[in-house]
Each structure stands twice: as C-alpha cells, then as structure tokens.
Amino acid sequence: MPARTAPTASDRTGPPPAPPRPDGPTHTAIGPYAAGMSDEHLKETTVERRVVHEGRFMTFRVDTIEDPQGKRHTREIVEHPGAVCVIPLHGEDVLMVRQWRTPVERVVLELPAGTLDRTADGGVEAPDLAAPRELGEETGYRAASWRKLGRFWTAPGFTEELMHLYLATGLEPLADYRGPDVDEYLDLVRMPWREAVALAEQGRIEDAKTLVGLLWLARLAEGGELAGKPVAQVDARQSRAGRHARD
C-alpha cells in the first residue's frame, strides 16, 4: 500500500480557510506558559496626560494613548494612593463592618479597609502601618499577630489602586477606643468566619475586596495555614494626624 501523504490546499474541498485578521484577537498561553513572551504587541503608549480634578486623596485625569497600531484613544484614569484590607480573625469569628456606600446607594457588609494616608513629606503611608491603624479605627481592636497575604489591583481598567490584604489574629480591644473617625458611621459585626464565607459563596456579599479576603481565608483554612506571623504592633492612633491634615 502506498504511503499516505497530507492533503495539499488543491486537494481540499470547499473554500480555503480565511486568513487571520491582523487586528483580530490573538490567543496566547498564560501562567507559566507565558514566560518569555513579549508585551510589545499589547502595549499602549501615553502621549498626553490632562488632570481634570484633584480631590482630597484621588486625582482624576484623561490620558491620550497610542495603541499598538498607532491609533489614538482617550482613557479616563483615577489616580489612587492604594489601600489596605484586613481579615480580623477572633477565634472562630471574623469582624466585619456595615456602612453606607453612596455610589451604590446601600449599606454594604465589608471587611475593615481604608486608603493609605498621605505623609507630611508628600509620600504615602506604608501598608504595614496602615493595616493596624484601619483595624483600630474601624473595629476598636488591635492584633498581636499579622500576616500579609498578598495584593491586587481593584479595577485596573480605570484606576491604579493597589489593595494590600492582611490577616490579623490575636485580637484585643483597645483600652482608649473612642469609635470610628468623625465622618464614618459603622456597625461592627462579629460572625463565625465560616458563615461569612458561606454568604460570599451564596452571592450575598458583593464587595470585591471582601470576597477576595473571605475566599482567601477559606483556602488558608483548608490548608491549615491560619497561624499568623508576629510583626511590630502599631498604635491605632498613629498617622491619624496625617489623615486630619489631608482632610
């Protein structure tokens, strides 16, 4: 029997396959398979930045960018100093807060979190200092043990805000706690952490950072990794002056 050969284009029936569109989507591997891949075919170049509003701690600007094909577009950007989110684990319970969020016009159940303060020299507060401060201000507790879990962009489509996530254990009430900041109205909620995770899995918690934190907590519990790593404790009142100066 003669050896079989692969069919040539002239042997195939039907129309030839359409060539790939030069401006169409390309499918590339991600994860470890992306090692060594170039980003140049995806990169946008900023050719102009225009600030349209400077707020207390955020700046709004409109950028003109040039895409990989040389076409120009506008991008609306929110500059943000970054933020922290804390998972306060009190035995088998987690501490959360309920507060009104004007953009969504409703009360939201969340993990304690807050924006990094501006420093006197124009810099930004270190996340490792901001996390204990926010925990103290929003819950009235301090933690004996801290573990930084990771960080993530909250909405990279329009803001550079980078959220730093922490696990806080060994909680103790602050002796001199006087409640949250004067412009914050919060309810402190304590519930079994497994119940909070269940609410997240059922779609009853819709805050993104809280979903990330609770599902991360569940993954740690599955692996028996809930023990924290001791770090220097920071008094909850530290850097409060920086916040008032910003306000």
Regions found by a protein language model. Name each.
Residues 62-64, 88, 167-169, 190-192:
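Short, well-ordered beta-strand micro-motif
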Residues 29-31, 38-47, 107, 148, ...:
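Nudix hydrolase/Nudix homology domain
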Residues 41, 78, 85-133, 175, ...:
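Conserved Nudix-box catalytic region and its N-terminal flanking loop in Nudix hydrolases
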Residues 81, 89, 101-102, 110-116, ...:
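Active-site segment of metal-dependent pyrophosphate-handling enzymes
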Residues 48-85, 90, 99:
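Acidic, metal-coordinating catalytic segment for phosphate/diphosphate chemistry
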Residues 72-73, 173-177:
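A short, acidic/glycine-rich surface segment
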